[in-house]
Amino acid sequence: MAALGTGGYVRNDAVEKLPTIMAGVPARRAQSSPPPAPPLCLRRRTRLTAAPEDAVQNRVSLEKVLGITAQNSSGLTCDPGTGHVAYLAGCVVVILNPKENKQQHILNTARKSLSALAFSPDGKYIVTGENGHRPAVRIWDVEEKNQVAEMLGHKYGVACVAFSPNMKHIVSMGYQHDMVLNVWDWKKDIVVASNKVSCRVIALSFSEDSSYFVTVGNRHVRFWFLEVSTEAKVTGTVPLVGRSGILGELHDNVFCGVACGRGQMAGSTFCVSYSGLLCQFNEKRVLEKWINLKVSLSSCLCVSQELIFCGCTDGIVRIFQAHSLHYLANLPKPHYLGVDVAQGLEPSFLFHRKAEAVYPDTVALTFDPNHQWLSCVYKDHSIYIWDVKDINKVGKMWSELFHSSYVWNVEVYPEFEDQRACLPSGSFLTCSSDNTIRFWNLDSNPDSHWQKNIFSDTLLKVVYVESDIQHLQDMSHFPDRGSENGMAVDMKAGVRVMQVSPDGQHLASGDRSGNLRIHELHFMDELVRVEAHDAEVLCLEYSKPETGLTLLASASRDRLIHVLNVEKNYSLEQTLDDHSSSITAVKFTGSRDIQMISCGADKSIYFRSAQQASDGLHFVRTHHVAEKTTLYDMDIDITQKYVAVACQDRNVRVYNTVNGKQKKCYKGSQGDEGSLLKVHVDPSGTFLATSCSDKSISVIDFYSGECVAKMFGHSEIITGMKFTYDCRHLITVSGDSCVFIWHLGPEITNCMKQHLLEIDQREQPQQNTKDGKWSRDPRQETCTSMPSEISLSPGEQTEDELEEECEPEELLKTPSKESLDSDPRCLLTNGKLPLWAKRLLGDDDVADGSAFHAKRSYQPHGRWAERADQEPLKTILDARDLDCYFTPMKPESLEDSILDTVESQRLAGLLSQSESPQEDGCRHPSLTPPQRESSEVSELLCSLESEVTITGTDSKPCAEEGEGAPGDQQDDFYLRVPSITSKDLNPPEDSGESEADLECSFTAVHSPPRPDPDPPFDVAVPPAPGCPGATEELARPEVPGLSNGSLPQTPEQEKFLRHHFETLTDAPAEELFHGSLRDLKASEAKDDFFNPRLSISAQFLSRFQKPSRFTHTFPTRLPRHPMQSPEVKLTDLAGSQPRAEPLRAGTGYTSPGRTNVLSAGKAEEPLEAWSPLTSCLTGLAPCVSSSSVPPTDKTPPTPTALPTPGLAQGVHTPATSSYVEATAGSRAKMSRSISLEDSKGPVLAELARPPCRPSSLGELSSLGQELRAITTTVTPSSDSEGQEPALPSRGNHEARASLKLTLSSICDRLLLPPPQLEPSAMCVWSQEPVAIQPNVMVTTASFSAPSPVNVSASRLHNSTFLPRFLAPEPLNTSAHPNSPPLPEARPGVPGNITSLLESAPDALSPVHRCPGHCGQPRVPARVPPPGPLELSNVGSIVHRLQTAFQEALDLYHMMVSRDEVSAEQQQAQTELASTFLWIHSQLEANDWLVGTDGAPAQALPSPGPPSPPTLCPLASPDLHALLEHYSELLVQAVRRKAQRD
């Protein structure tokens, strides 16, 4: 609120005389009364000119101030005539009438905080001093509230001011850096005398006869005399004449208060020092007497004709006789720090003394001689007015308790018609850095449930979130007292944000340390306290009640959002980390799909939709808007259609919550400086209030952007705003510790009420059709509520808004398709299209990406011509290959889809696992329960019985239906999966993604377009275990050059990679994060972990600390169903007892803090860094116990650089999430691209061969296929014992799951041919210990449960390596006496299965030797020679096989059908499931073994150089030559790159 003319606030009488417009009466009827401005609700219809400036300024008035900023007696004064008390509150002078408990306010128009004030002797004027540069001394008329005079004469702030008793002069003293003392003739606005002082002055006082005044300060007591005769003769400024008081031995004291005597003591001057000395000076400036107050510290002083009041520490106010300095009494102490004001219902409670209680210090005193009232201000920002007529019976007249530090947030308690309310109607809450949450109510009518307490008429309750009381007192100003308490002040304390649940039962609050608390509002008990974040919580939001959900979102400066389930005792549902900087606001909306919208300092707005998965609720990103300015706050209107965002450029941008498109942008602040910090939409959705960093507040029409009112009064930035539900008040809070209640003008209130009435009328016909339940689909469950049909502003839209509402609702969504027809060649974003793109689309006026179809075939020219090539050889961007990723399918077209849900990450399992790691052993915390695994194996058994072979184009990645590892999606998402909907996997076309983002997404396997349902060949990649057809044999081989998406296929691609990713490194040496979740526990002396907190954020980030940061560039995915292998007994060479420990086969599973020792001369690396590589070259997966490796130091393990990023994807080491990594936008781009830098990761010594060029394209393609199989199927290793990390979705990046790049970056490996392993180098993994290094024995298992490595690698060797390895000469076991023996028994395999396997040893003999064991002694093999094939033996074997398999199958079905399963039955069920999977994998492996041994001679390869395998006939000889040429260019480019490096 601004003032008129000279700057004072003048009440507008015209506004007060306006007739009240009743709610529901049309606003047109009110035009008969001439208001100062047209009715707001008609402005859009009539398009009238804006209201005059004075009307705008007076539509909102300041009604009440809850707060005080007085730091000493200079900020408190009293009118001697009326008894009114004036004190400072930011930029406002509050004039309090204690009898009536009413306030009047004078606002400083200069927007500078006030530092001092004083009443004139007659009480008509108030003089104020300011802070800041070039402060002014202003004179205000108390009655008119306007400015009378303004005097400029200081530079750096005014410390104290005073009227002379004869009202001729005003004295002002500057701050320490100003040190100017001015005497003003305020009626003439001139300085009559001036001087500079040499030390800091704290207080001053005029003598009763106005002949002199006294200033006191640091070792300073000085008397200044006014020469009247000199003033009459000299017209200019004259120097002041000053004389110092004679202090004697007290000259080293710092004096903080001074008062000249009154009445009989008019010739005396009284001073008080910080050290607790009360001194009296006589007329000759001589220290006459002094006494010790016997306190640790004193701060203020005031006198009457008979009494002296000295304010001291611990709430003490001592009273002395003025003429003798005899001690009389002490004032009663105020409340003790930490008092429960709700318990103070009786007056006697004030005088109840608590043992060891601490009381607030007294900082300011003023005395009313007429009423004998002493006003006291205490250090906790409380005010007491004591009646001291009888010092032996002192009573309290009035009191109030305010916040003592920054107020961060305000919430208005919801309105309830029944008895559910926990607080009276009209209550609101504020939270502050003083560690309190305060409940206020301005209603003067007492509520039956809430009686008024004796401390305050407005304060209902104080909740103390911490037991520490040091923050309850104002620690921001120490007036040269030093750190007398000797304790350090934690400036990061306090409650930062809070939110009341929609049902009014719970209060969620987040503090500045990252803790989340939940209070129950009936009894104010703390229900939940969670260390949620590593930095201060910036936003809390409950889900809307109409959504049918009870969720709480917590956003923090640590850039993470935690979604908690209220119904499950605030358990963690999901953690989102899309943002790369502080998250400033998060909101829920219930329009159509239930959404979460968040904005942050990274200039991004993320729109997420909710999906119901089997393991809980997950939010998947649907839109991303990237602005060019920082976003500080946002709010959603009542229709849930639009979100208003406060931006740093002082604009308010309004976005559609459905499609994320910007609808409006208008100015949110009337000034030209600062940034918008807060925005809040009123309950009717008619207006919004904004706060700017210039400390101003604006009320703006939400639809037109016109400024309705502007106010100011806070001295610090406004940190929170809320409209009350009665549409009458606006509450603002600020960093100046004050709460302002603004009264809205009648025209604003009536317009809001009319809008609410119209909304209710429109909603009545829809009451029977609203439904907030989940809309369940066979493939996915999306949280939806019925869309509100409320228009932007009923009957008040502009033409373009009316046209928009006439459009079908479907246009706001990403269009769905009935079939997989081709999408446009270019993927459209929110930006404008270039001319060639418009021509390509056949429409030059295309502006929306909702529905596009090419109308004519236009071929672009230049470099874009290659992008439209129709040949099977694809370049970087071909939109037709991405057609199934960007347009959702109708639900009926998803009948046969295996994709059920797209799950995001969860931390519930991680949190539970971290608490009890020994309970689950090596099992993943979110590993499937038996019934979950049973469904998985049942699907497998069905596929076994029906003998169905699923080809590549028909195979689809599946998601778990149980409570599996969320976010662990298949690595096969680069396949063309026609049934995957873009709503689940990809952002819609209007999501704000740029074409540059999509240009990086050529990672998909670019298969040719499908002209007919039966193409000549299909691209097949084995799905992960757990999906139907996961273990089926591949029907057709892959096509070289087409299926290998990990290799750049053109020089343009290679150039693109070099240009965009040449700065990426695959072996960062300086990793900031060390240790995993286990390392977060009790830190030892030499542990130097970056964050000791075990918050949810710390545990979330700890999952990404151990692996190489280079893997973060590539979002990796786990198989949906991680399988448990049979238990393998492992023996330690040191003589420890063997213990059974379930390990995952083929994963290199190891415990944190332990490493496997490689060959001599190599540094120790974790097993997970080399075991997958071993598997990829041998086809076998070693299962090594962590107990067989000597433990290393207990220091946090150093980061491990994986051999290749492609391998890292297969191993699935979680990506590092840190504050030094790329932003969300750049990370999204990098996640779909790769660097061609050479790998710096560890390489096995046996594989360290010099790079050599492949002999042919076939070898290069086969190597790429090998790497593809490894990156696709290797099961991840764990970085924490007893659990397997489930990679989160990297901030809901499932939308880009199909665009993941898996290109390997090991250039040397690309130059190497597949290793030629001789049969003599092959060994069988046995249970006998194999020496790796001296004194280190590793026991390995011959057979393990099938894993993706076993299934895919064996199939891989069938097509590429094994024919070359085994065909040149038959396997002769006698020629290899050192071969290890086959085991007698296989752990985890039933006896009948073991006998079956033993009877057919030929199928098991050709096994490779692990490269990690090359050069070590081999154990002689005990393999019986193959005997003659007898039909009787075959029949017996077949009979036993059928019987055993049927018995096992029946037993398994019986256990699965039971509802309750015991622990033993669960173990047996797991054993059977693992065995079935193992049999399936062995059958696949047996197929190629039999084909190799029993093939005719002409089918066997010749012993000469192997020829490149022809996996699929090429389309033409020209294409074959073209691929050869591209291969040559690629090899040359890679070699040049390697040579330069």
UniProtKB/Swiss-Prot annotation:
PANTHER family: WD REPEAT DOMAIN 62, ISOFORM G (PTHR45589), WD REPEAT-CONTAINING PROTEIN 62 (PTHR45589:SF3). It is found in: Nucleus; Cytoplasm, Cytoskeleton, Spindle pole; Cytoplasm, Cytoskeleton, Microtubule organizing center, Centrosome; Cytoplasm, Cytoskeleton, Microtubule organizing center, Centrosome, Centriole. Its main location: nucleus. Disulfide bonds: none annotated. Residues 762-820, 911-1050, 1133-1153, 1185-1212, 1273-1293 are annotated as: Disordered. Residues 781-795 have a biased composition (Polar residues). Residues 797-809 have a biased composition (Acidic residues). The modification Phosphothreonine is found at residues 46, 1050, 1275. WD repeats lie at residues 109-150, 153-194, 196-234, 291-330, 357-396, 402-450, 490-529, 532-574, 578-618, 626-665, 671-713, 714-752, 803-846, 1138-1180. One of its GO terms (cellular component) is nucleus. One of its GO terms (biological process) is cerebral cortex development. This is WD repeat-containing protein 62. The modification N-acetylalanine is found at residue 2. The modification Phosphoserine is found at residues 33, 501, 943, 1095, 1125, 1151, 1235, 1255-1256.
